Design a protein with these regions (language model features):
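C-terminal substrate-recognition "lid" of short-chain dehydrogenase/reductases
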Residues: 170, 204-228, 233
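Conserved glycine-rich cofactor-binding loop
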Residues: 14-15
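Substrate-binding pocket helix/loop in short-chain dehydrogenase/reductase
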Residues: 88-89, 96-101, 193
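Active-site loop of short-chain dehydrogenase/reductase
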Residues: 5-6, 73-74, 119-132, 142, ...
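Alpha-helical segment proximal to the catalytic Tyr-Lys
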Residues: 117, 159, 163-167
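Active-site helix of classical SDR
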Residues: 112, 150, 158
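The beta1-alpha1 cofactor-binding region of Rossmann-like NAD(H)/NADP(H)-dependent oxidoreductases
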Residues: 51-62, 94, 207
Length: 236
């Protein structure tokens, strides 16, 4: 068990933004606990992979327990796991609702609770969640009620937790992306999706990684919802 390096827990870490975050934090010298349903073991001794469904409280408990057992502490939690189901409001099924709420909200709630318990032991820590600019700026033709419901709730919880734990050394922030080039968006969609942003193009995974790394080192910033969205939240 090592306590000499900072330790970050990253959910949804197997691909896209999550995989970028694993790389970015390792380059900063962090020990990384990476979790997702499909995560594979790493040959890097400073990366601990823990497979499981983050919506399940038992997975959250196992991730935190193994993080502390292997690395001795938790400095940062990145709540990156999330799913997006785009449908007209009246076409959402009960299964859609349950799945999105479970991953986006339960996947935030349980592991954040447990991480804060560990952070309080050191009177220091940082939680940063990935939400969406659609919460603040709905787009015609992109039906997103479930994303707005769940990620909007996390934005609100971010501010509430930031105030609750401000005097206990724990900061809580969120990054609110626009549409990012990830494996979920085929290359044939990039031009159309890029046109939804005032800057005229989609964001890159590294845009989100760098925003999260900035927040992790910005000790005077808490309760912030940082929009990384090519101007979407500012208007059209």
């Amino acid at each position: 068990m090592s306590t000499s390096k900072k330790v970050v827990v990253i959910t949804g870490a197997s691909q896209g933004i999550g995989a970028g975050l694993v790389k970015g934090f390792r380059e900063r010298g962090y020990q990384v606990v990476a979790t997702s349903r499909s995560i594979k073991p790493s040959s890097d001794p400073d990366i601990l992979a823990v497979a499981g469904d983050i919506a399940d409280p038992q997975t959250a408990e196992r991730v935190i327990r193994e993080a502390v057992a292997h690395f001795g502490r938790i400095d940062t939690l990145v709540n990156n796991a999330g799913i997006f189901v785009a449908k007209p409001f009246t076409e959402y099924s009960q299964e859609d609702y349950a799945q999105v709420v479970a991953t986006n909200m339960s996947g935030f709630f349980h592991i954040s609770q447990l991480a804060i318990v560990e952070m309080e032991k050191n009177a220091s820590g940082h939680i940063v969640s990935v939400t969406t600019s659609l919460v603040d700026h709905a787009i015609d033709g992109v039906p997103s009620v479930l994303a707005s419901l769940t990620k909007g709730g996390i934005n609100a919880a971010t501010k509430s937790l930031a105030i609750e734990y401000a005097k206990r050394g724990i900061r809580v922030n969120a990054v609110s992306p626009g549409i990012i080039k990830t494996p979920m968006h085929g290359e044939e969609t990039h031009a159309a999706l890029g046109s939804l942003h005032p800057v005229g193009h989609m964001g890159e995974i590294d845009d989100i990684v760098q925003a999260i790394l900035y927040l992790d080192g910005a000790n005077f910033v808490t309760g912030e919802i940082l929009h990384v969205d090519g101007g979407q939240s500012a208007g059209h």
